[in-house]
């Protein structure tokens, strides 16, 4: 993992929100992010993460900017550190179809917060306002600006990828191991050929249209 001075400085620049909030007497800051709002299949997953003060985590960045190998390394470093607190929320395809993806995403985030081992004083949420008893601050593109949100984005992404690999073993014909449920040409062609599986989001327009054709 890159532990160069520039990488450490980059991480330190990403804890500005957290340091500002601590100076305002919000002692415990949790970053919240999700993975899987856009795919045509699989659950939506959220993570809440509280990073320990004064500790540097090289590699923590927006999960979309990291390679799979880098993400896995950072995920392992976060999960193996006893001072890092995190929670995971998973909302099923059935629930997504029932309430819509935005509401399902919020439910996943609330689940993740509830599963934290300690209660935060304030929530930093990537791109969404989350109704909660705990004060909430929405940060646009927060996974690129806040270390806590970036850590949450990595934990959520890695957890969801693991779930999609499990689904791949059940439905190998769709290639979930390659695209994780996103609407690639390979995935769309597989749906056309085999029809939607139980883990496809029937409320999403492309799936809905293909169901109508079938």
From Swiss-Prot:
Gene3D superfamilies: Ribonuclease H-like superfamily/Ribonuclease H (3.30.420.10)
Cofactor or coenzyme needed: Mn(2+); Mg(2+)
Cofactor binding summary note: Manganese or magnesium. Binds 1 divalent metal ion per monomer in the absence of substrate. May bind a second metal ion after substrate binding.
Pfam families: RNase_HII (PF01351)
Catalytic function, reaction form: Endonucleolytic cleavage to 5'-phosphomonoester
Class of the enzyme per the UniProt entry, highest EC level: hydrolase
UniProt GO BP: DNA replication, removal of RNA primer; mismatch repair
Domain of life: Bacteria
InterPro entries reported in the protein's UniProt record: RNase_HII, RNase_HII/HIII, RNase_HII/HIII_dom, RNaseH-like_sf, RNaseH_sf
Manganese in keyword set: yes
PROSITE patterns: RNASE_H_2 (PS51975)
EC assignment: 3.1.26.4
GO cellular component, one term: cytoplasm
RNase H type-2 domain sequence ranges: 27-214
Subcellular location: Cytoplasm
Residues reported to bind a divalent metal cation: 33-34, 126
Known role: Endonuclease that specifically degrades the RNA of RNA-DNA hybrids.
Family statement drawn from the similarity comment of this UniProt entry: Belongs to the RNase HII family.
Descriptive protein name: Ribonuclease HII
Species lineage: Bacteria, Pseudomonadati, Chlamydiota, Chlamydiia, Chlamydiales
